Amino acid sequence: MKTKNLLLVLVVGAMALGCNSVNQTSAPLKTAADTASFYLGYLNGNGMAQMGMTDLNMNALVAGMNSALQKKEMKTDQRDMEMYLNNYFQKLSIMRAAANLEKGKKFLAENAKKAGVDTLSDGIQYKVIKAGEGPKPQETDIVKVNYKGTLLDGTEFDSSYKRGEPAEFPLNRVIPGWTKSLKEMPVGSTWEIYIPSDQAYGPRGGGPIGPNETLIFEVELLEIVSPEADKK
């Protein structure tokens, strides 16, 4: 990841998280600048944590920020700094991807032994929460669903429930794990679906979803909006 892109990610992340509640620091925030400083630090820290940057030296981080704010002359030029950071984050991403892949494999192996959990093709697992009796969608259908998605640690990264309305999408334009599992779901069903990383977002991840993350979705299939049969 290029350093300039990293900065953009942190700023955009801060804007996206800005409406969420933040637990107040124990340090007194007496002025507007105090509050803005704390919020900026919190939101950027949140963005860095989502990217797996949890082993940073906080003293060095603050020292670097102070040096920049005070416009101190540096012995290392900016280009060399960016090259160093690009290499560092590339290695960090590789390590994080390997750890996530191993964690996902271990979770799925244990999950497959649980009562009520079945396995589809390509290692996709599911558990029926509510059995529907409607038709099953085809790959070319448009479906209407309610859903929420979480990481293995319980972090929720998406939810139609929180948006207040169901989602509609062509079944052949989503991640493979969704396409393959929803094709087996009768309308009216609610399933919990466990999707291996290679059937989700793979080594690239996306947003709060890290590289090689195994994902858990609770999906309620409400209806087939545009059945393929109606197009013939």
Q: Which residues are covered by each model-predicted region?
A:
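Cross-family detector of peptidyl-prolyl cis-trans isomerase
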Residues: K2-L6, C19-K232
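Oxyanion-binding "anion nests"
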Residues: L10
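Glycine-rich, flexible loop motifs
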Residues: G13
